[in-house]
Amino acid sequence: MSWITPDLIEILLSILKAVVILLVVVTCGAFMSFGERRLLGLFQNRYGPNRVGWGGSLQLVADMIKMFFKEDWIPKFSDRVIFTLAPMIAFTSLLLSFAIVPVSPNWVVADLNIGILFSLMMAGLAVYAVLFAGWSSNNKYSLLGAMRASAQTVSYEVFLGLSLMGVVAQAGSFNMTDIVNNQAHLWNVIPQFFGFVTFAIAGVAVCHRHPFDQPEAEQELADGYHIEYSGMKFGLFFVGEYIGIVTVSALMVTLFFGGWHGPFLPPFVWFALKTAFFMMMFILIRASLPRPRYDQVMSFGWKVCLPLTLINLLVTAAVILWQAQ
């Protein structure tokens, strides 16, 4: 058939890759919510969800059905358009952040030359979703949570971006695939250890995960910026948070731990195992650390993380200039 051209086949394969990878990311985010509840129960010497299915295996399905049939209520005093758009923007921006992550040599949705900048741009877009949700709800607790989230995310995105500049300088490219190929013999976590530490801290803060979950602090803000949300709108925020964890874990693997590189096993398996390890670390951090005060979080970022990233950049620049001579 003459209408089947190589360009059409390439487009269809790209669409197939995008659908498969994005479905896997959404599924991983959903299953992580169940795994987190089970592991937190184990860490705290109690039972997790164990009533639906064998060992609670169908709890995720039950939660999805319950959330789907809940009333999609919009407060009368809210801005309906922005209130509805906020969870969609949050979910979409976090999902698109994964599009530039190469899971194997031939599997990447968008192999952009500005991959890192695109990821940072999507992380910045998620801030607007939180701000829209808090402001449009017309609720004082929602607005306070949104203001906290905006200030925290914008601050820690500075450290997130600066921590990656050392990796970019070493690889000589913003392209994720080039960065992974540059780690074929030595992972970036060794020469860029301080950059990795700062990126890990900033990644947890940008995801609003414990101990940086002040925007959702139940004891202070009654669940923060999504207090007025219910039904699938709340579900988009909920699943989006776990997709953010999957994305940050995948970025850690790609930028600092060699991506798909590893012996014996297929590249995709190595990438999945490394990503799963960092997803487990998110859960362990939640079970282990207390929540600090909000002023302590901001002070830690500007007084500890920022100097650490600047020192890392100066050392990286000095080493690169010394090697060039």
Swiss-Prot record:
<comment type="subunit">
    <text>NDH-1 is composed of 13 different subunits. Subunits NuoA, H, J, K, L, M, N constitute the membrane sector of the complex.</text>
</comment>
<feature type="transmembrane region" description="Helical">
    <location>
        <begin position="304"/>
        <end position="324"/>
    </location>
</feature>
<dbReference type="InterPro" id="IPR018086">
    <property type="entry name" value="NADH_UbQ_OxRdtase_su1_CS"/>
</dbReference>
<feature type="transmembrane region" description="Helical">
    <location>
        <begin position="265"/>
        <end position="285"/>
    </location>
</feature>
<protein>
    <recommendedName>
        <fullName>NADH-quinone oxidoreductase subunit H</fullName>
        <ecNumber>7.1.1.-</ecNumber>
    </recommendedName>
</protein>
<dbReference type="GO" id="GO:0048038">
    <property type="term" value="F:quinone binding"/>
</dbReference>
<keyword id="KW-1003">Cell membrane</keyword>
<keyword id="KW-1133">Transmembrane helix</keyword>
<keyword id="KW-0874">Quinone</keyword>
<keyword id="KW-1278">Translocase</keyword>
<keyword id="KW-0520">NAD</keyword>
<dbReference type="Pfam" id="PF00146">
    <property type="entry name" value="NADHdh"/>
</dbReference>
<dbReference type="GO" id="GO:0009060">
    <property type="term" value="P:aerobic respiration"/>
</dbReference>
<dbReference type="GO" id="GO:0016655">
    <property type="term" value="F:oxidoreductase activity, acting on NAD(P)H, quinone or similar compound as acceptor"/>
</dbReference>
<feature type="transmembrane region" description="Helical">
    <location>
        <begin position="237"/>
        <end position="257"/>
    </location>
</feature>
<feature type="transmembrane region" description="Helical">
    <location>
        <begin position="154"/>
        <end position="174"/>
    </location>
</feature>
<feature type="transmembrane region" description="Helical">
    <location>
        <begin position="50"/>
        <end position="69"/>
    </location>
</feature>
<feature type="transmembrane region" description="Helical">
    <location>
        <begin position="11"/>
        <end position="31"/>
    </location>
</feature>
<dbReference type="GO" id="GO:0005886">
    <property type="term" value="C:plasma membrane"/>
</dbReference>
<dbReference type="GO" id="GO:0003954">
    <property type="term" value="F:NADH dehydrogenase activity"/>
</dbReference>
<feature type="transmembrane region" description="Helical">
    <location>
        <begin position="186"/>
        <end position="206"/>
    </location>
</feature>
<dbReference type="InterPro" id="IPR001694">
    <property type="entry name" value="NADH_UbQ_OxRdtase_su1/FPO"/>
</dbReference>
<keyword id="KW-0997">Cell inner membrane</keyword>
<comment type="function">
    <text>NDH-1 shuttles electrons from NADH, via FMN and iron-sulfur (Fe-S) centers, to quinones in the respiratory chain. The immediate electron acceptor for the enzyme in this species is believed to be ubiquinone. Couples the redox reaction to proton translocation (for every two electrons transferred, four hydrogen ions are translocated across the cytoplasmic membrane), and thus conserves the redox energy in a proton gradient. This subunit may bind ubiquinone.</text>
</comment>
<keyword id="KW-0472">Membrane</keyword>
<keyword id="KW-0812">Transmembrane</keyword>
<keyword id="KW-0830">Ubiquinone</keyword>
<comment type="similarity">
    <text>Belongs to the complex I subunit 1 family.</text>
</comment>
<feature type="transmembrane region" description="Helical">
    <location>
        <begin position="114"/>
        <end position="134"/>
    </location>
</feature>
<feature type="transmembrane region" description="Helical">
    <location>
        <begin position="81"/>
        <end position="101"/>
    </location>
</feature>
